[in-house]
């Protein structure tokens, strides 16, 4: 791999060229979730009180109204801060920038409110929510129920804090906290399935049965999209391409558009380099040539590097381990409902490689069906949109009066 200034070459590719998307598997529905059509949402929730679904991940935060097919706004889960210049009164404050805008100015101090999917900076998280709700969606939060997604193994105190923020800070009339994995299953029109979710900050395999997480059989890998981006950035630096924090979007674009999963890593390594080498033209006119890095990058998800004291396993082995912790009957059911989710599962070749490895790992008689929806990077949000639109769900909201009577602990009775 090497980087250089612009030169004429017909083999160069522009970053504007979209990466071909993977072909979705047949969506075999097992035990379907009853759902109303999106067009009926207005009959249930008047526009002024329509529920808002918020799915905040380590990489992006998605927000939109329940009943929509996709989120209205998606922003990077990042906050940029710098001191304000003192006003005439002599008071100073903090100026903040949300999402992609925070990366543009190198002098900003960047804050990432989530770590491995878990909120660790509540002030920063609330600023992002407020910006999305009040500035982007332009809603008055005291008029709208709010549904938040919650990751596996989230601390109980985080769920209590979500309730407090929703009612005390955002002044919402009602709220709900829903499991991310369960919402992903709902997005596929089911109530049971093995969720294989690899996003920006963490990777999980979570069995969901009849709408409940089976945490005893859940596997976790602290390696996901941000690690792949860091790997690719290091390769670009070694090629002599200087990068700053404002170039992170550039690295992400290269990763999403050109990296792919090899069906057989060793065979791909043995191919002549000219068969997979790509020369890319960057927006600033520079060029960079990428070779094996294009498939070595997402290979980390299938063969994670060893770390001292740990021997992490890849996605396919994680899925096998989750299934083996289930009863035989449940294992057979969920093996036919393996659901790929998360933005880091969108690489070309990902679905085929995962399916082939899982089939080899399980007994020959196991019937395996892997579903890979084209919009699986939005699976959690879509599931929340479906759930908050159902007539049967409307009695499940945690209401302000209930919170005032019972405090944040109401979340355990109403949401889990």
UniProtKB/Swiss-Prot annotation:
Gene3D superfamilies: 3.30.420.40, Actin, Chain A, domain 4
Protein's UniProt keywords contain Nucleotidyltransferase: no
Record annotation: effect of changing residue 380 to L: In SPGF53; uncertain significance; reduces interaction with ACTL7A
Disease listed for this protein: Spermatogenic failure 53: An autosomal recessive infertility disorder characterized by impaired oocyte fertilization due to oocyte activation failure, in association with structural anomalies in sperm heads.
Ranges in coiled-coil conformation: none
Tissue: Testis-specific.
Full protein name: Actin-like protein 9
The organism's place on the tree of life at top rank: Eukaryota
Task performed by this protein: Testis-specic protein that plays an important role in fusion of proacrosomal vesicles and perinuclear theca formation.
Native organism: Homo sapiens (Human)
Subunit structure: Interacts with ACTL7A.
GO terms under biological process: acrosome assembly; fertilization; single fertilization
Region (Disordered): 1-40
Name of the gene: ACTL9
Family designation: Belongs to the actin family.
UniProt cross-references to SMART domains, sorted A to Z: ACTIN (SM00268)
Record key words, sorted: Cytoplasm, Cytoplasmic vesicle, Cytoskeleton, Disease variant, Fertilization
PANTHER family according to UniProt: ACTIN (PTHR11937)
Main localization, broad class: cytoplasm
SUPFAM superfamilies: Actin-like ATPase domain
GO terms under cellular component: acrosomal vesicle; actin cytoskeleton; perinuclear theca; sperm head
């Amino acid at each position: 791999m090497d980087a250089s200034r612009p030169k004429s070459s017909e083999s160069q590719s522009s970053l504007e060229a979209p990466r071909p998307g993977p072909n979705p598997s047949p969506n075999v529905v097992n035990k379907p979730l009853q759902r109303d059509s999106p067009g009926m949402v207005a009959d249930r929730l008047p526009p002024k009180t329509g529920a808002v679904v918020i799915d905040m991940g380590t990489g992006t935060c998605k927000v939109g109204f329940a009943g929509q097919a996709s989120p209205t706004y998606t922003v990077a889960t990042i906050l940029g801060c710098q001191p304000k210049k003192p006003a005439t009164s002599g008071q100073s404050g903090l100026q903040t920038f949300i999402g992609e805008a925070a990366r543009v100015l190198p002098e900003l101090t960047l804050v990432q409110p989530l770590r491995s999917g878990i909120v660790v900076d509540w002030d920063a998280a609330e600023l992002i929510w407020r910006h999305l709700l009040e500035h982007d969606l332009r809603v008055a939060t005291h008029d709208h129920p709010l549904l938040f997604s919650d990751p596996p193994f989230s601390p109980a105190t985080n769920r209590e804090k979500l309730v407090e923020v929703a009612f005390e800070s955002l002044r919402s009339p009602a709220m709900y906290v829903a499991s991310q994995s369960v919402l992903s299953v709902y997005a596929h029109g089911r109530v049971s399935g093995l969720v294989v979710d690899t996003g920006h900050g963490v990777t999980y395999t979570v069995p969901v049965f009849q709408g409940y997480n089976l945490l005893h059989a859940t596997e976790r890998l602290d390696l996901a999209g941000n690690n792949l981006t860091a790997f690719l950035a290091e390769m670009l630096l070694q090629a002599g391409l200087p990068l700053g924090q404002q170039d992170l979007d550039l690295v992400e674009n290269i990763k999403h558009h050109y990296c792919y999963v090899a069906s057989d890593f060793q065979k791909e390594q043995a191919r002549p380099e000219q068969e997979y080498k790509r020369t890319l033209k960057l927006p600033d006119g520079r060029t960079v040539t990428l070779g094996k890095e294009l498939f070595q990058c997402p290979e980390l998800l299938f063969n994670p590097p060893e770390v001292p004291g740990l021997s992490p396993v890849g996605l396919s082995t994680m899925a096998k381990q989750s299934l083996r912790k289930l009863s035989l009957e449940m294992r057979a059911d969920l093996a036919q409902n393996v659901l790929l989710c998360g933005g880091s599962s969108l690489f070309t070749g990902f679905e085929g490689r995962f399916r082939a490895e899982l089939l080899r790992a399980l007994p020959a008689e196991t019937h395996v069906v892997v579903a890979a929806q084209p919009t699986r990077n939005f699976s959690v949000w879509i599931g929340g949109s479906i759930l908050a639109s159902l007539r049967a769900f409307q009695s499940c909201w945690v209401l302000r009066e209930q919170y005032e009577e019972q405090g944040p602990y109401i979340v355990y009775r109403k949401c889990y």
